[in-house]
Amino acid sequence: LHRLRFLLAPMVHWPEVMTAYEETEKILFSADAFGRFGSLERTARAPWVPQARRYYYNIIGKYGAQVQALLKKISALEIKTICPLHGPVLTEGLEECLRLYDLWSQWEPEESESILIAHASIHGNTAHAAKTLKGKLEKKGVQVNICDLTVTDLSYAVASAFYCGKLVLASSTYDGGLFPPMREFLEHLQTKGFRNRRVGLIEDGSWAPAAARLMRTKLEEMKDIHLYETVVSLRGALNQTNEAQMDALVAELCAE
């Protein structure tokens, strides 16, 4: 005998979402929750977390409050299997899956001291500055990820930004505005509810650098974003003044 119990889960991530719990075999049919990118044929044995993280933040991420509501509904259930609409059936490590969904849906970082440096460079000078900062931080023993927004699929960049507790944005100025890859990245972060992070800024612009001001304006529209005081402002290639600014930014990034 199989008995199904239906649990509404609106906006995870569609308005009409409903999950089902099969009481005999303890199976949760979770709809879009606990899904993962990747075809079963090619990624069946791949670790669940990286692609589940990317799926969560890019598909469900905006609806953290609704995910929290679903987690409360299923908290009293004994679950032996999770069957999502996307990705593999889950039969192992379910406690960790639930723990991560609780963390992700509260917009908390998995690694609070890790830093993502996301850069959008036109001719390479901004990218060089980003890589220089990475080297300085790694000498301090900091875990650093770096992402070139001009070539990286934004879904990976977004997932990495949420994974880390700190973010450094490095962008060239373009026609008096933000270089489009950085502008699009910030729009994606805002759409997915990016919050609770510490952020540093690097800008570049030969005549009138404006990227830092524009990035700050966009970040101030997000919740609980702490901006570091030091801004590295380049006018082309990295120089001694910028090196001093960068050392000050490194000190701030490592102080908390």
Regions found by a protein language model. Name each.
Residues 4, 27, 115-117, 199:
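Conserved hydrophobic helix-helix packing surfaces used for dimerization/oligomerization
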Residues 83-111:
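Short N-terminal or domain-adjacent regulatory/targeting segments
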Residues 30, 85, 118-120, 202:
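Short hydrophobic segments within beta-strands
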Residues 9-10, 99, 147-152:
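Short gly/ser/thr-rich secondary-structure transition/capping motifs
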Residues 40-82, 86-89, 132-147, 157-256:
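FMN-binding flavodoxin-like domain, especially the glycine-rich phosphate-binding loop
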Residues 118-140:
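Short, charged N-terminal beta->alpha structural module
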Residues 33-35, 86-89, 122:
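Glycine-rich beta-alpha junction loops
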Residues 1-45:
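Catalytic core of the metallo-beta-lactamase
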